[in-house]
């Protein structure tokens, strides 16, 4: 059974005449007649009662007509969906993320993408960078979002944008630092860094930044994540450095101030298989790059 046979049958049923159906289909009558006969032979039933005035559906034909219409509609829908999928307009994108990217970057990306490609679906999973790389290779995620990815063969790391650094300190320490929020001033402060796992990391970058400025950091704790670091800061256990997206969120007993002498910025990056041909990933990257150009 072919879609062509279904189209010819539906046209003949709706017109009540094979000749009229042929004119509607912009073909000659004999092919329509042959294909309807072939369809009847395939089904093993008569679909039409034929007369000099035209054709009339048999009970079997009337029952088959509704199914034929549904099959034709399904065929059209399937073609449309397959073409949309090839353009990345539908399909599921699986994303792994880590750390402070969830505060502004990930929500902004997801909002922009769902506005541009409403037919796509998204899934998010919190996972360390090492697991993101493993998941990319295994095909269980299409994209990772985070910072300071290691160089890996077959993996592309694309910097999306850069954020300035802020000092985060408890209320009493912040009052002292506010007049001189510099790396040099932090030389005498206890420093809480994050994260503990996943080298290279934000903690490594902060240490390197301070050493480039001639300051040997007094690291008193390296904790699991930014929330743990800010918890210690709020308790007066030290200070930490955070990206601008974290500084923008108000927290009890924590004050933030932009670094006065640090021009360095930290990247937010996307990572994916270099040779990926997943259309919905390509569509997502196009949206992300357009947004990058607007920053």
UniProtKB/Swiss-Prot annotation:
One Pfam family here: HTH_1
GO BP term, pick one: catabolic process
GO cellular component: cytoplasm; protein-DNA complex
Membrane-crossing segments per the record: none
Source organism, top-level taxon: Bacteria
Gene3D superfamilies: Periplasmic binding protein-like II, Winged helix-like DNA-binding domain superfamily/Winged helix DNA-binding domain
Function text: Involved in the regulation of 3-chlorocatechol degradation. Transcriptional regulator of tfdB expression. Acts as a repressor in the absence of its effector (either 2-cis-chlorodiene lactone or chloromaleylacetate) but acts as an activator when its effector is present.
Name of the protein: HTH-type transcriptional regulator TdfR
Organism this protein belongs to: Cupriavidus pinatubonensis (strain JMP 134 / LMG 1197)
Gene that specifies this protein: tfdR
